[in-house]
Regions:
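Short, mixed-charge low-complexity intrinsically disordered segments
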Residues: 40-59
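Short aromatic-glycine-(Arg/Gly/Cys) micro-motifs in beta-strand/loop hairpins
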Residues: 1-21
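Generic structural motif
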Residues: 9-13, 29-31, 58
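Intrinsically disordered, low-complexity boundary segments flanking structured domains
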Residues: 11-13, 37-41
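A short, exposed loop/beta-hairpin motif centered on an aromatic-Gly-Thr core
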Residues: 19-30
Length: 59
């Protein structure tokens, strides 16, 4: 498994349209799997808009 750092922005009703930035670090087999796990952990796409703008492998 590799470790990935994922940076994303999200906004929802409680942010009054303002984008908030967040990061997460995930162990996964691929970038795709890391993004999927991050979305699951943070509930991205359920009741918010989001943009994942950077995924980097941590060496």
């Amino acid at each position: 498994m590799k470790r990935y750092n994922i940076k994303f922005k999200y906004r929802d009703e409680s942010s009054n349209g303002k984008w908030n930035e967040q990061e997460c670090t995930i162990y996964a087999d691929s970038k795709y799997a890391a993004e999927k796990e991050c979305k699951k952990i943070y509930g991205l796409g359920i009741d918010c808009e989001y943009i994942i703008y950077e995924v980097t492998e941590i060496i």
